[in-house]
Curated annotation (Swiss-Prot):
It comes from the Bacteria. InterPro entries: AadA/Aad9 (IPR024172), AadA_C (IPR025184), NT_sf (IPR043519), Polbeta (IPR041633). Disulfide bonds: none annotated. Keywords: Antibiotic resistance, Plasmid, Transferase. It catalyses: spectinomycin + ATP = 9-O-adenylylspectinomycin + diphosphate. This is Spectinomycin 9-adenylyltransferase. One of its GO terms (molecular function) is adenylyltransferase activity. It comes from Campylobacter jejuni. SUPFAM superfamilies: Nucleotidyltransferase (SSF81301). Disruption phenotype: Loss of spectinomycin resistance. The keyword Cell cycle does not apply. GO terms for biological process: response to antibiotic.
Amino acid sequence: MNINEFPQQVNQVISIAETILQGQILGIYLYGSATMNGLRPDSDIDILIITKQELSNSIRADLTKQLLKISGSVGCIEKRPLEVTIINQSDIVPLQFPPKCQYMYGEWLRGEMEAGEYPQACNDPDIMILLWQARKNSITLKGAESKELIPAIPFHEIKKAIRFSLPGLISSFKGDERNVLLTLSRMWFTLVTEEITTKDVAAKWVILKLPERFPPLLTTAKEAYLGNLSDEWETVEKEAMALVEYMKKQIEELLRTE
């Protein structure tokens, strides 16, 4: 894919990073839906930046102010939400769990960021999955190839990350039903196949493995994600929670196996 074919926001992020980070950049990568089966109506644009040093507070502030201007809200195709992650390479070589992230911009943090609270460094199990995904399936926008900067990640580290992330995901179900169901689908798919895929493809795979009472619910989540219908969960809350519990048990069983 030619860089001119990317959404305008991708080139804007590259420009912002080059201006603010200057000589710190080792590589910039596009990953996620954009590099798999294409961006869906509610998809973020996922970008990983690997640097050769930690970020100062002034750099965090400058990055955040600029990204707030170009990142859009969920469902806005013309101005998509951005998820921009910055990692200092020395924090992941050698690999540690949970990995350290220098900075993450995401629309769920907009209120805090607009109030002047800029993303800080943190250790996050989900970063292991992000790194695995970027190493396996990303487009290099600038610098070295991802496999040159991200060490090989054993699959047991992915299982560990899923194990750590599962309780928090389940607890966020109320009000985020579609995303939780689709993320559980992707966890299940990944644990069986040792591959990563988009949420709708994972859901299609999981639907074939569900007891007959559950496929309509997951189909609703999948079709809403694809923009084919509007999903409403209040009237099926009990059944949807039962589906979550069923999927959780399948995932936990897979996590127990070596």
